[in-house]
Design a protein with these regions (language model features):
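Broad structural signal for hydrophobic residues in well-ordered alpha-helices, predominantly aliphatic
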Residues: 25, 62, 122-123
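Helix-loop "lid/cap" segments that line or gate small-molecule binding pockets
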Residues: 48, 56-67
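Glycine-/proline-rich flexible loop or hinge segments
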Residues: 55-61, 77-82
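Generic structural signal for well-ordered secondary structure
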Residues: 14-15, 54, 154
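C-terminal cap/substrate-recognition subdomain and adjoining C-terminal extension
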Residues: 71, 75-78, 82-205
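Short leucine-rich amphipathic alpha-helices used at interfaces
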Residues: 50-51, 93
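Alpha-helix initiation and N-capping motif
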Residues: 15-18, 57-58, 70
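Active-site neighborhood of HAD-like aspartate-dependent phosphohydrolases
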Residues: 1-50
Length: 205
């Protein structure tokens, strides 16, 4: 059995799910956004400076979710799912490619910087498929809010992958992504491809 790596955002669909979710949460709570605007602005600037780090996003993530009870957060995530699916632009050629790999008996591993809980909600058909494993960023409750405990990006993708399949360090037959930020994972791929916004692939040497 071959393992196949797929990124999600920019590869299987064009949008950045985590970015769309953060914008949704800011927009859906206008009163809270206005009252906390100076703090949110500071958190956003902090994120721009340290965008690749888990702790770089956490102040903004904490403020956006502050004061939300779990039931309310679940309702908002369901509302986000409806809005996101109405607007998302799938990369059909890559979805077809993934389907072909599965039909050939391959095991697909989707590793995404988006929240794993969001992916599971928006795309339950992926997370429930016996030939697909989804790995994403992790969160946990913290002081009346929610924070990221692990950001699934860059080298962290490789760490989370190895944790999921420990003690085996799997190698991929083929890998697909839209970004060379996934180079640590691509180095585990026998064949690695970059995907453009039209779904066309280019071999990475």
């Amino acid at each position: 059995m071959n393992y196949i790596f797929f990124d999600l955002d920019g590869t299987l669909h064009q949008q950045d799910m985590l970015e769309a979710y953060l914008k949704f949460m800011i927009r859906i709570r206008p009163v809270w956004t206005v009252l906390s605007f100076p703090i949110l602005l500071g958190c956003f600037l902090f994120y721009l400076l340290f965008s690749k780090k888990t702790w770089g996003l956490n102040p903004l993530f904490f403020m956006i979710h502050f004061g939300l009870f779990r039931k309310k957060q679940i309702r908002l995530i369901q509302a986000f799912k409806t809005e996101f699916l109405d607007e998302v632009q799938p990369v059909n050629s890559m979805l077809k490619q993934m389907k072909q790999h599965i039909q050939a008996g391959d095991y697909v591993v989707i590793i995404s910087g988006s929240l794993q809980s969001l992916i599971e909600t928006v795309y339950p058909q992926l997370t429930k498929h016996k030939k697909i494993k989804v790995i994403g960023s992790q969160t946990q409750p913290f002081l009346g809010s929610t924070i990221l405990t692990s950001r699934c990006s860059g080298r962290n993708k490789l760490r989370l992958l190895d944790e999921q399949f420990s003690p085996e360090k799997i190698k991929f037959e083929v890998g697909y992504t839209d970004s060379l930020a996934d180079l640590p994972v691509l180095k585990r791929c026998k064949w690695a491809y970059l995907v453009n916004e039209n779904g066309k692939i280019t071999l990475v040497n």
